[in-house]
């Protein structure tokens, strides 16, 4: 699963998921899966969607993952009283804003790409839409 090799700090503040997304254009492939809402994508969700897509295209084409989980999320163990410091890092998330392209695909027909992205979207906690590369 995806996670950073090294980080400057082990734990981070919770923060808020506001603002507008960067990476809103399809830049590597021909087709893309774009987020419509905001959410926190876990590394497990990113990997599950990637597997669903790669199984759907049957080793044809190429898939790009445009998001990376770089924020650590901590949890305290079960039945532990409050206080005594912040919990341990349990998983990593990527903060997603509306308009962010999550995945891209190339080397397959549009019908196959739509089908693969539909399977991937079912694994994700955010509403998504299918986009194509716009050539100026």
UniProtKB/Swiss-Prot annotation:
The keyword rRNA-binding applies. GO terms for cellular component: cytosolic large ribosomal subunit. GO terms for biological process: translation. Keywords: Ribonucleoprotein, Ribosomal protein, RNA-binding, rRNA-binding, tRNA-binding. It holds the Pfam family Ribosomal_L16. GO terms for molecular function: rRNA binding; structural constituent of ribosome; tRNA binding. The keyword tRNA-binding applies. It comes from the Bacteria. Belongs to the universal ribosomal protein uL16 family. Binds 23S rRNA and is also seen to make contacts with the A and possibly P site tRNAs. Part of the 50S ribosomal subunit. This is Large ribosomal subunit protein uL16. The lineage of its organism: Bacteria, Pseudomonadati, Pseudomonadota, Gammaproteobacteria, Pasteurellales. The gene is rplP.
